[in-house]
């Protein structure tokens, strides 16, 4: 995993909607998972561009701004800045966190759709759309709810059922109602512009069938949608808060928020390289077929990234690299229930940082990452993971080793003597775990990677208990102390993508003066240099008592009460 075989990666996190603060499920489903990937790939020596941004347009922002008596732009900008600041506090290492209201994005979207239109993939048609006579607005997809005609779910949206994942049209819903006021809407005639998705059926089928990197759930869902038959997708909306549609005759329309935000991955990359004074370099990523683009999304976003986005990229006539894979997750629940702000179910990312450090949360969320099935967050599980895994397993091993070196060798990393069988076995485990963890990281299976990291620290504790170097004379304690320090270095590097701040602290406690991010994964193979001076040891983590946890939960409730009053 040295620098000689550098790959180019686009690490792309689904764009948070600037309607409010994301919750923990949103975070692990996209942005946090993408950050773990980006940090690992940089450690691996690859060339990485990691972007996301705030999705600022659409009816929800427009309606909320109306209620508050302010402009949609002011509301969205304020929320964007808040979300951006929160991501910084969560240690998210974006190369660029952009927004759909940026001039670069607006220009790119309009130019992009002009090309799609000129290539014959856009047509206009008169359609009947739901209109709420009470609120006096046309109701876009997400503002119509009703019963899914496929699975019977009674809270399906007009564009997609979140229960079965099927793409929908508002008129397909049974018992439709206005999501704003709950009244029954009426159908009215209006003209809209559509993306001719069915024209691209064969190209999409080839892309899905030939792409061996797509996970089974994404492949199967996409093929099922193709078998059911694709339908044209609306490109325009009647609401005013959005990017003006560039099609002739569509001067009073805006681009549908889903169909413009999904292009933000490209515009954010363009914006990033322009800010670095390299305005053409984005093409080295987006127009190079060897580039690996990975989209970190929840399972409800799969069709937009495996079908609609590839179709748009193909329709543009440019040679944009199609999604290499989607790293989709199942749902993170809160005590078995979906997160809901109105019902106070869940924890939001601003609240979380008011009670515990970001690294504690990052560690817990990766431990609970719903890679194969829905996972449930509970406060009891949070306490168990922090106390047992982070503190007692990793923290205890690291501190034991550092204290041993301080007491036996005056804080100077020792050189080894002869290696006994148990020493050789432990050294091989360090190297083997490094390879295994890297494989899971490259497969974006971070929960499993963390399990193997924990196995290494558990083995380290067992190794120390077996060798008992504190009972040996200084000469005999050299080899076990040398290997234990090697394991701590391995843990610092392997944990860096997950808990970056704590890993940097671990790095400093090993006597390194620089930033761990400047090092490479393959350096796990190298032990801490004998003679390196270590600072005085101090615990990296601490246990959380049940009383402290109870106080934290109460503090979150108090914060919510103060905000709603």
Swiss-Prot record:
User: GO biological process annotations for this chain's record?
Assistant: methionyl-tRNA aminoacylation
> In terms of domain of life, where is this protein from?
Archaea
Cite a single Pfam family from the UniProt record. Answer: tRNA-synt_1g
Its principal location? cytoplasm
| Reactions catalysed according to its record | tRNA(Met) + L-methionine + ATP = L-methionyl-tRNA(Met) + AMP + diphosphate
Q: Which GO terms describe its molecular function?
A: ATP binding; metal ion binding; methionine-tRNA ligase activity
Concerning Gene3D superfamilies, the annotation shows: HUPs, Isoleucyl-tRNA Synthetase, Domain 1, Methionyl-tRNA synthetase, Zn-domain
Intervals of motif 'KMSKS' region: 338-342
What subcellular locations does the record give? Cytoplasm
Q: What is its EC number?
A: 6.1.1.10
Stored InterPro entries: Anticodon_Met, Met-tRNA_ligase_1, Met-tRNA_synth, Methionyl/Leucyl_tRNA_Synth, MetRS_core, MetRS_Zn, Rossmann-like_a/b/a_fold, tRNAsynth_Ia_anticodon-bd
| Binding, Zn(2+) | 148, 151, 161, 164
Asked if the record carries the keyword Aminoacyl-tRNA synthetase, the reply is: yes
Q: Which residues form a coiled coil?
A: none
Query: Per the annotation, how and in what number is the cofactor bound?
Result: Binds 1 zinc ion per subunit.
For the keyword Zinc, the answer is yes
Query: Which keywords has UniProt assigned to this entry?
Result: Aminoacyl-tRNA synthetase, ATP-binding, Cytoplasm, Ligase, Metal-binding, Nucleotide-binding, Protein biosynthesis, Zinc
Residues binding ATP: 341
UniProt cofactor(s)? Zn(2+)
Q: Where is this motif: 'HIGH' region?
A: 16-26
Record's function text? Is required not only for elongation of protein synthesis but also for the initiation of all mRNA translation through initiator tRNA(fMet) aminoacylation.
Instruction: Write the protein's name.
Output: Methionine--tRNA ligase
Gene assigned in the entry: metG
């Amino acid at each position: 995993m040295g620098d000689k075989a550098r790959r180019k990666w686009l690490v792309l996190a689904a764009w948070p909607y600037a309607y409010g603060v994301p919750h923990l499920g949103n975070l692990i489903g996209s942005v946090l998972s993408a950050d773990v990937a980006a940090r690992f790939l940089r450690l691996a020596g690859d060339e990485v561009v990691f972007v996301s941004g705030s999705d600022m347009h659409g009816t929800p922002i427009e309606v909320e701004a109306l209620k508050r008596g302010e402009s949609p732009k002011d509301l969205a900008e304020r929320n964007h800045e808040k979300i951006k600041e929160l991501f910084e506090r969560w240690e998210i290492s974006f190369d660029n966190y952009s927004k759909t209201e940026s001039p670069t994005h607006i220009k790119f979207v309009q130019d992009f759709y002009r090309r799609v239109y000129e290539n014959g993939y856009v047509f206009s048609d008169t359609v009947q759309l739901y209109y709420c006579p009470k609120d006096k607005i046309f109701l876009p997809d997400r503002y119509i709810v009703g019963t899914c005609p496929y699975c019977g779910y009674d809270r399906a949206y007009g564009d997609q059922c979140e229960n079965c994942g099927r793409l929908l049209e508002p008129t397909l819903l049974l018992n439709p109602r206005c999501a704003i006021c709950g009244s029954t809407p009426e159908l009215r005639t209006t003209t809209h512009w559509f993306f001719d998705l069915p024209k691209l059926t064969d190209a999409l089928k080839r892309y899905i069938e030939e792409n061996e990197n797509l996970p089974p759930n994404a492949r199967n869902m996409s093929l099922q949608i193709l078998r059911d038959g694709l339908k044209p997708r609306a490109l325009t909306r009647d609401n005013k808060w959005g990017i003006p549609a560039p099609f002739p005759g569509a001067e009073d329309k805006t681009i549908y928020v889903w169909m413009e935000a999904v292009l933000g991955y490209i515009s954010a990359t363009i914006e990033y390289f322009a800010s670095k004074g390299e305005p053409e370099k984005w093409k080295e990523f987006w127009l190079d077929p060897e580039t690996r683009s990975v989209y970190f999304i929840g399972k409800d976003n799969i069709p937009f990234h495996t079908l609609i986005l590839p179709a748009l990229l193909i329709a543009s006539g440019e040679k944009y690299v199609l999604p290499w894979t989607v790293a989709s997750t199942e749902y993170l629940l809160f005590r078995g229930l979906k997160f809901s702000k109105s019902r106070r179910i869940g924890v939001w990312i601003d609240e979380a940082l008011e009670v515990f450090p970001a690294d504690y949360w990052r560690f817990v969320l990766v431990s609970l990452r719903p890679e194969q099935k829905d996972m449930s967050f509970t406060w009891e599980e949070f306490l168990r993971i922090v106390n047992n895994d982070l503190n007692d397993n990793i923290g205890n091993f690291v501190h034991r080793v550092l204290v041993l070196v301080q007491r036996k060798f005056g804080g100077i990393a020792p050189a080894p003597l002869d290696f006994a069988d148990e020493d050789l076995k432990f050294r091989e485990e360090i190297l083997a775990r490094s390879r295994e963890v890297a494989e899971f990281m490259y497969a974006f299976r971070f929960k499993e990677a963390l399990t193997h990291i924990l196995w290494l620290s558990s083995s380290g504790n067992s190794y120390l208990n077996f060798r008992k170097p504190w009972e040996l004379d200084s000469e005999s304690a050299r080899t076990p102390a040398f290997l234990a320090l090697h394991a701590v270095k391995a843990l610092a590097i392997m944990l860096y993508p997950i808990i970056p701040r704590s890993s940097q602290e671990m790095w400093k406690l090993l006597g390194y003066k620089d930033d761990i991010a400047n090092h490479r994964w393959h350096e796990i193979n190298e032990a801490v240099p004998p003679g390196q001076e270590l600072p005085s040891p101090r615990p990296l983590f601490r246990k959380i008592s049940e009383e402290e946890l109870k106080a934290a939960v109460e503090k979150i409730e108090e914060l919510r009460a103060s905000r709603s009053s």
